[in-house]
UniProtKB/Swiss-Prot annotation:
SUPFAM superfamilies: Aconitase iron-sulfur domain. Heterodimer of LeuC and LeuD. The lineage of its organism: Bacteria, Pseudomonadati, Pseudomonadota, Gammaproteobacteria, Pasteurellales. This is 3-isopropylmalate dehydratase large subunit. Catalyzes the isomerization between 2-isopropylmalate and 3-isopropylmalate, via the formation of 2-isopropylmaleate.
Length: 469
């Protein structure tokens, strides 16, 4: 029987499935961080249980840490408690931890692939919704809750119901200036933020194949933003080239054997998907969100939609509420919207490719006077090291940006990088919900190049018409 890639991955990891019951999956890799793991470890202690597979669990610090200092003693309140608890729990259980004093530390969804912890064919979980990022490697990766974190620590398994399969095909090649972020925002704009609910999505088509691994990670990262359980890209030579030589990737004959297996990880030609979505790559423009969910997005060459022209009453009401919060009027030209802050970072767009794209825009330019702050936050210590080797940090600083240490930073209001009330931000992150970047902050999701251009020109501009250096 023909199978989709998702069905192959799921079936290969079923440990036990009784009639009428939810299957139990084996978990190959468990990634943990300081926010969703403390209660899970407490649960183990109370029950008198041990971590079952310490060699399959890896920790890092990212969500609540400061990107300004590397000293845990400089952290305050809950952030300090969370970081200290993670360090204590990892040490007590023999779990490998990439802490703030190591260059390998970083955002969990940047660190994992960098270290070769993310490999095709695996099941990967983490107490974070954007675990879907790792699906770019042909791994079944999804976020879990804290009680499930405890369950995986104790058993290395998880109960999981089968999802439906969705294929999203992006046909043809994108035009110059169009990035992975624009592709995935266009997908979300077409499907709406609930279009993938109940599905695992496989991204395919020439435009997806043309992407680097960094770009594929950006696309899979935001699968969750249209309701999907996980996102997938079938592994290919681009995948293998990225992984070869990584610290935790197979070596020697094990590598050769692994690649032979990984080449089988693709949907069968006659596999049946429950849902299919098709986009033409040539029609995708640089994207900017105008509302308060990622599905409220349009091309930079368009105007803010008019809720009065929306036939569906729920969509209309949502748009009216979003515009009231975001402070925009219907029919406003997207290129006439000034910004107060710019954030380049997050698990969506903080890899070296993203920083190079931003630097190409910012080189030889200065931050616009109306822009209060520009934060550039690398996704890991290794990304930071590479960027500094290439001189990108100097470009950012000379342009008037702040060059920070690795961490989740202003993606979410959980640390000391936040928007002020009613400030408007061009952000390379993945969510533009109300208050996501700080109380009453206004977030517009864009690509790194678009964010950098907004910083330099003080408003959203069409990156296709900006000279790159």
């Amino acid at each position: 029987m023909a199978k989709t890639l998702y069905e192959k991955l799921f079936d290969a990891h079923v440990v036990y499935e009784a009639a009428g019951e939810t299957p139990i999956l084996y978990i190959n890799r468990h990634l943990i961080h300081e926010v969703t793991s403390p209660q899970a470890f407490d649960g183990l202690r109370v029950a008198g249980r041990q971590v079952r597979q310490i060699g399959k669990t890896f920790g890092t610090m990212d969500h609540s840490i400061s990107t300004q200092v590397r000293d845990v003693n400089k952290l305050e309140g809950q952030a300090k408690i969370q970081v200290l608890e993670l360090a204590k729990n990892c040490e007590a259980n023999g779990i490998s931890l990439f802490d703030m004093q190591t260059k390998e530390q970083g955002i969990v969804h940047v660190m994992g692939p960098e270290q070769g912890l993310t490999l095709p064919g695996m099941t990967i979980v983490c107490g974070d919704s954007h675990t879907a990022t790792h699906g770019a490697f042909g791994a079944l990766a999804f976020g879990i809750g804290t009680s499930e974190v405890e369950h995986v620590l104790a058993t290395q398994t998880l109960k999981q119901a089968r999802a439906k399969s969705m294929k999203v095909e992006v046909r043809g090649k994108v035009n110059p200036g169009i990035t992975a972020k624009d592709i995935v925002l266009a997908i979300i704009g077409k499907t709406t933020m609930a279009g993938g609910t109940g599905h695992v999505v496989e991204f395919c088509g020439e435009a997806i194949r043309d992407l680097s691994m960094e770009g594929r990670m950006t696309v899979c990262n935001m699968a969750i933003e249209f309701g999907a359980k996980a996102g997938l890209v079938a592994p290919d030579e681009t995948t293998f080239a990225y992984l070869k030589g990584r610290p935790h990737a197979p070596k020697g004959k094990d590598w050769d054997d692994a690649v032979e297996y990984w080449k089988t990880l693709k949907s069968d030609d006659d596999a049946v998907f429950d849902s299919v979505v098709v986009l033409e790559a040539k029609d995708i423009a640089p994207q900017v969100t105008w509302g308060t969910n990622p599905g409220q997005v349009i091309g930079i060459d368009q105007v803010v939609p008019n809720p009065q022209e929306m036939a569906d009453p729920v969509t209309k009401a949502s748009a009216e509420k979003a515009l009231a919060y975001i402070g925009l009027d219907a029919n406003t030209d997207m290129k006439n919207i000034p910004v107060d802050q710019v954030f380049i970072g997050s698990c969506t767009n903080s890899r070296i490719e993203d920083l190079r794209a931003a630097a190409a825009v910012m080189k030889g330019r200065k931050k616009a006077d109306n822009v209060k702050r520009v934060l550039v936050v690398p996704g890991s210590g290794l990304v930071k090291e590479q960027a500094e080797k290439e001189g990108l940090d100097k470009i950012f600083i000379e342009a008037g940006a702040e060059w920070r240490n690795p961490g989740c930073s202003m993606c979410l209001g959980m640390n000391d990088d936040r928007l002020g009330e009613w400030e408007r931000c061009a952000s390379t992150s993945n969510r533009n919900f109300e208050g996501r970047q700080g109380r009453n902050g206004r977030t517009h999701l864009v690509s790194p190049a678009m964010a950098a251009a907004a910083a330099m020109f003080g408003k959203f501009v069409d990156i296709r018409h900006v000279e790159l250096n």
